[in-house]
Amino acid sequence: MIPLANGFRVSFMHGLDRLSPVIRKLKIPVILLGGGLQASLPYRSGIKRPQDESVKAFIGAIIDKSGSVGVRGEWTQDYLKQLCFNDVDVIGCPSMFMFGDKLNVQKKTPAIDADSRITINITSRITEMGPIVESHTAKYPNLSYIGQEMDALRLLLWGEGIRKMKDPNPIPVWPSHPLVRDGKTKLWVDPWPWIDYLRGTDFTFGTRIHGNIAALLAGTPAFVLGHDTRTTELARYFEIPNKLISEITPETDAAELYAEADYGPLNANHKKRYDTFIGYVERHGLSHVFQPGEDPTLFEKKVASIRYPDSVALYSGSAYQRYSRRTKRRVAKTIRKTRKRLHI
């Protein structure tokens, strides 16, 4: 089973090229579970893309083993059909079915106000989020930012910002940012405490698809700001409230997004989408915890019995001290190498 969320992209061509010959040599079935095209918006059908040949070889190898492939949304399905593959099923992303056919997202408060508990998720390279972060940091004192990138982890562990992005920056990529400096940046290495935290919040929004899915799994309203085909097609397939990042202005407010969001279609059609997903899984001979005779609550009970680490946090002073020591070691190492080369 191969889950490739955004594997059909230029930067992963080498990965596909390595996988294709391996798959062809296998003597067992190979199943693609939720593959996706990553491309800029608006999605354009029928154009030639640099990764086409790599994708053709990869999908051809899988279909020879399993007969069909499962993809995240209709744009990816259309893309593969343009490459002459017709055995393509739209099944969404497995993460949305963590709790099977049960999903119940309800608004916990009539409206969002200054006292609301809001979380924001951000893709650091999406600069359009800068003004949104600034305005919401000022307006909502209970706002927190949940990091999901390695850059965010380095920031919390070492106080190390993204060098190619200026400091100060409206996006929380440096220790000087108020959301980082004031301890409002969080990051979990396990999904369960992350989801538990989101159960205690009122609203989540931003550009990270799984940051928003984590909230939905917690029963908390979420709103996706789509910035590429991968995030947008998935939000549309699952009927998660969403807008394109191009539709967002510096004045866009979480309260407005919350007010316009309708979670009725998301909830009402979840069972149908679950049946589609499970039908694909069973058609390919995979067993699963939701089938007759299995008890999915056993796993949930085991998860509940585990004490997970708290979120990674930037503790005042200590991260800077670690980063300082790390930097000094790097400088000392560079000086030693330079002296050795110069025979000093």
Where are these regions (language model features)?
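Active-site anion-handling motifs in enzyme catalytic cores
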Residues: 1-344
